[in-house]
Amino acid sequence: MSNNPRSQVITQGTQRSPNRAMLRAVGFGDDDFTKPIVGIANGYSTITPCNMGINDLALRAEAGLRTAGAMPQLFGTITISDGISMGTEGMKYSLVSREVIADSIETVCNGQRMDGVLAIGGCDKNMPGAMIAMARLNIPSIFVYGGTIKPGHYAGEDLTVVSAFEAVGQYSAGKIDEETLYGIERNACPGAGSCGGMFTANTMSSAFEAMGMSLPYSSTMAAVDGEKADSTEESAKVLVEAIKKQILPSQILTRKAFENAIAVIMAVGGSTNAVLHLLAIANTIGVPLSLDDFETIRHKVPVLCDLKPSGKYVTTNLHAAGGIPQVMKILLVNGILHGDALTITGQTIAEVLADIPDQPPAGQDVIHSWDDPVYQEGHLAVLKGNLATEGSVAKISGVKKPVITGPAKVFESEEDCLEAILAGKIQAGDVVVVRYEGPKGGPGMREMLAPTSAIIGAGLGDSVGLITDGRFSGGTYGLVVGHVAPEAYVGGAIALVQEGDQITIDAGKRLLQLNISEEELAQRRAQWTPPQPRYPRGILAKYAKLVSSSSLGAVTDIDLF
C-alpha cells in the first residue's frame, strides 16, 4: 500500500495537474507528491491561556512531519474559553464548540483527502472535539495536548483558576477582604496552559493517553516546558509510522480502550465531563458504552491520586510523580487494565508500560499505592431515580455528607441561582435545582462552576445539594449532581419540581429522588407545557434541534433520518 492512499487522488495523474499547481504554491516540489499529506489541526488562540502556546507546538509538529517524510498542512480550528465564559450566556457555546471543532476537522481532512491528522488542543472541548473527528475520519491520527498550566502562588498557597471562583463566594460571605480577592485574581493563572487541577482538560488528555491516542507522559506535561515541544515533534514522527502501518482509530478506540480510559479517570479523580465526552466518542466510533459501564468500573477502581479540585495537588505534581504511565501500571498489575489494547505507537498498553515500576515512587503522596488509596472506590457515581430515569452523574470524592434530603430551591437559570447564593438566600439543608440548562434547554448544557464555587466559598459545600440538567466544571466538587436526564426541556421530571418539594440525594444508594407520589408526579406532567425555544435562529437553534440526551453523550449526528 502507498503511504498516501487518500491524497493520491489529488496528487497523481495528468488530470490532477491543476491540483498540483496549487500545491506547488504552498511549498510542494516534484518529490513531495508521493508523500503522505498530514493535517495539523491547530487550536491556537489568544483568547485563553489554555491555547496561547499551541502555535509553537504546531511548528514543532510541522518540523517533525517533514523530518519523517510527510507533507504537513496546517489549518486552524476554534476554541471557546470555558473559564472566561463561565457564568455568562457565552458558556452556552462551550459544548457546542465540541461539535464545531469535530465538524471543522472532519471537513478539512476529508475535503483535502488528508492521509493522517495531528490535532493540538488545550481548552476543555478541544480534546473531545478532535477525538470525535478522528473517530469519524478513521485515518491515522494522534492527539497532542497543549499542556497544563503551572500553579499560581499567593500567601503561601498554590492556586488554580478555581481558587478565584471560590474566592468570590468567600468574599460575598465576608470570609476574605477585597485585597485578598484581588491577590488571588492576579496570581491564579501565571501563564500558558490549561487549568491546572484534574479538571476537564487534564482529565481528557489523561484519558486519551490511557486510550493510546497520545504519547506516554504527554498528557501531564506543563505547556511552557521544553519537553512538551519535544513530545510534540516525536508525536509527529510516530504518526507518520502509523500512516505507513495504517494504524487506525477504529483499531485503537475499542471497548477495551474505553474501559481503560474510564479506569484511569476514576484513579486520578477526573471530571464528570469525561462521562459525557467518552459517551460521545464511543457513540461516534460505534463502541457500545453506557452510563452503567462507568458505575461498574467505579466499584473496581480506587482513587489513587490526591489532586484538585477535591484534593491537594495539581497536574504538574502528578507528572513529577510518574504521570499517567505510573497510574496505569498500578492499575495494570492489579488486573484492572486491558494490557493487550493497541496504541498509536503500534505497541500494546502492556508493552508501553513494561519498564514502569509496579509501585509509585517513595517520598511523594500525589500517587498512592493500590493498598493505600485516597478513596476505596471511584468518585464518579451514576445516580438514578424518578428525577433521573436515564441517569445523572455525581462526583462524590471528598463529600463529607453523601446523603441529603431537603427542600428544593428552584431556579430556571444559572444566573438566578448565583444571585440567590450571593444574596445569602440558600441555607444549610437546601437542595438547589437549576433546570432548563440541558443540551436542548440551555441550549448548550452550561457548566455550573460559578454557583457551586459560591456555595463552597460560603461554607455550605457540605450542607447544600445542587442538581441540574446542565453540567459541572472539572473544578467543581461537593454534593452536586449534573447531567440529569431526561432534561427539563423535553419534560423530564426535573421540570416538574416545585419550590419546597423534598428531594433526596443519596450517593451511597446512587439515588436521586423527588419525594412525591407517582400520582402527583403524573398530574404535574399532564399540566406541563413545553417552553418556547430560547433561540429561533443561529447555531444555538441548530444545536438545540439536533442534540441528543446527555445520557447518549449530547451528540448531534444520530437519528437524523
From Swiss-Prot:
Cofactor dependence: [2Fe-2S] cluster; Mg(2+)
Reaction(s) the record says it catalyses: (2R)-2,3-dihydroxy-3-methylbutanoate = 3-methyl-2-oxobutanoate + H2O; (2R,3R)-2,3-dihydroxy-3-methylpentanoate = (S)-3-methyl-2-oxopentanoate + H2O
Listed PROSITE patterns: ILVD_EDD_1 (PS00886), ILVD_EDD_2 (PS00887)
MF annotations from Gene Ontology: 2 iron, 2 sulfur cluster binding; dihydroxy-acid dehydratase activity; magnesium ion binding
Residues bearing PTM N6-carboxylysine: K125
Coiled-coil segments: none
UniProt keywords, alphabetically: 2Fe-2S, Amino-acid biosynthesis, Branched-chain amino acid biosynthesis, Iron, Iron-sulfur, Lyase, Magnesium, Metal-binding
Pathway: Amino-acid biosynthesis; L-isoleucine biosynthesis; L-isoleucine from 2-oxobutanoate: step 3/4; Amino-acid biosynthesis; L-valine biosynthesis; L-valine from pyruvate: step 3/4
Domain of life according to the entry: Bacteria
Ligand binding (Mg(2+)): D82, D124, K125, E447
Active site: S473
A biological process from GO: branched-chain amino acid biosynthetic process
Record Pfam families: ILV_EDD_C, ILVD_EDD_N
Residues bound to [2Fe-2S] cluster: C50, C123, C195
Cofactor comment text: Binds 1 [2Fe-2S] cluster per subunit. This cluster acts as a Lewis acid cofactor.
EC number: 4.2.1.9
Subunit structure: Homodimer.
Family: Belongs to the IlvD/Edd family.
Role noted for this protein: Functions in the biosynthesis of branched-chain amino acids. Catalyzes the dehydration of (2R,3R)-2,3-dihydroxy-3-methylpentanoate (2,3-dihydroxy-3-methylvalerate) into 2-oxo-3-methylpentanoate (2-oxo-3-methylvalerate) and of (2R)-2,3-dihydroxy-3-methylbutanoate (2,3-dihydroxyisovalerate) into 2-oxo-3-methylbutanoate (2-oxoisovalerate), the penultimate precursor to L-isoleucine and L-valine, respectively.
Listed name of the protein: Dihydroxy-acid dehydratase
Species whose genome carries this gene: Synechocystis sp. (strain ATCC 27184 / PCC 6803 / Kazusa)
Lineage: Bacteria, Bacillati, Cyanobacteriota, Cyanophyceae, Synechococcales
